[in-house]
């Protein structure tokens, strides 16, 4: 696509949403509680802030503000407000006066922000544990959230990933013609490295005329030792290994396809 000469600022909003899952098997209630505590500490608000700050660096965004919170009993959230251009400290108003209305803040966040929310959980009896991280990178202007794809998937040890990319709004060129997208894309997969694509089974559902792109990813290689918490495969019988493997694989298939699979 040839470069466009725009009339004013690029008003297109580009949003990339991730749903990333890490799956684990923890046999006892104590093990499940231990996994939840471990993953909650591993991906606390401070760690997530580091990941998102690096994401800002990768996509070329400037950080305006960071809000973070760890929750009880578990989970964390981080939201970073970003801009396309560097901010001059001399232009920042630090005087005492009422801030903007919440309506104004939300409108700004909807333009350029990066946020993450985490959701550790476990099955009450079956030994299955999942960690889900929801991430949204939403930018306006020439900044592209697609640059952060490989980094975010790698950082969050992803077994399963669902991604949505959409472009909204329009921008005008100097002749007044509206443009509803400013780059070529037919799949989110085109913005992934070959090494990353080799690791996953992938499936696309795209609505090209609406500038909506959806990709699902499921890790290809399954090694039981990577999915056990406080246990090793050698300590289990062959029957136990098969039972746990079947349980984990069924869980991963259900999450990947977004529907429950009946027991046969």
From Swiss-Prot:
Is synthesized initially as an inactive proenzyme. Formation of the active enzyme involves a self-maturation process in which the active site pyruvoyl group is generated from an internal serine residue via an autocatalytic post-translational modification. Two non-identical subunits are generated from the proenzyme in this reaction, and the pyruvate is formed at the N-terminus of the alpha chain, which is derived from the carboxyl end of the proenzyme. The keyword Lyase applies. The active site is at residues 112, 117, 140. Its cofactor is pyruvate. Binds 1 pyruvoyl group covalently per subunit. GO terms for cellular component: cytosol. It holds the Pfam family AdoMet_dc. It catalyses: S-adenosyl-L-methionine + H(+) = S-adenosyl 3-(methylsulfanyl)propylamine + CO2. Keywords: Autocatalytic cleavage, Decarboxylase, Lyase, Polyamine biosynthesis, Pyruvate, S-adenosyl-L-methionine, Schiff base, Spermidine biosynthesis, Zymogen. Catalyzes the decarboxylation of S-adenosylmethionine to S-adenosylmethioninamine (dcAdoMet), the propylamine donor required for the synthesis of the polyamines spermine and spermidine from the diamine putrescine. This is S-adenosylmethionine decarboxylase proenzyme. PANTHER family: S-ADENOSYLMETHIONINE DECARBOXYLASE PROENZYME. It is an enzyme of class 4 (lyase). Heterooctamer of four alpha and four beta chains arranged as a tetramer of alpha/beta heterodimers. The record marks 111-112 as: Cleavage (non-hydrolytic). It comes from Serratia proteamaculans (strain 568). The modification Pyruvic acid (Ser) is found at residue 112. Its EC number is 4.1.1.50.
């Amino acid at each position: 696509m040839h470069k466009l000469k725009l009339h004013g600022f690029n008003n297109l909003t580009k949003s990339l949403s991730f749903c990333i899952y890490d799956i684990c098997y923890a046999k006892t209630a104590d093990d499940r509680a231990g996994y939840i505590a471990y993953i909650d500490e591993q991906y606390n608000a401070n760690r997530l802030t580091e990941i998102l700050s690096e994401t800002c660096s990768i996509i070329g965004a400037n950080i305006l503000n960071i809000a973070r919170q760890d929750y009880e009993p578990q989970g964390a959230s981080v939201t970073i407000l970003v801009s396309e251009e560097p901010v001059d400290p001399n232009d920042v108003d630090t005087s005492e006066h009422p801030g903007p209305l919440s309506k104004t803040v939300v409108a700004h966040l909807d333009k350029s922000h990066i946020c993450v929310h985490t959701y550790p959980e476990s099955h009450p009896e079956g030994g299955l544990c999942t960690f889900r991280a929801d991430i949204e990178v939403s930018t306006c202007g020439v900044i592209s959230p697609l640059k952060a794809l490989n980094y975010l998937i790698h950082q969050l040890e992803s077994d399963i990933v669902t991604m949505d990319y959409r472009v909204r709004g329009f921008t005008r060129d100097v002749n007044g013609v509206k443009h509803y997208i400013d780059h070529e894309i037919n799949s989110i997969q085109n913005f992934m490295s070959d090494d990353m694509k080799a690791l996953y089974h992938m499936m696309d559902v795209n609505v090209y005329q609406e500038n909506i792109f959806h990709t699902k990813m499921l890790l290809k290689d399954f090694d039981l030792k990577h999915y056990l918490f406080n246990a090793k495969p050698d300590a289990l019988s062959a029957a136990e290994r098969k039972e746990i493997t079947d349980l984990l694989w069924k869980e991963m298939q259900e999450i990947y396809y977004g529907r429950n699979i009946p027991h046969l």
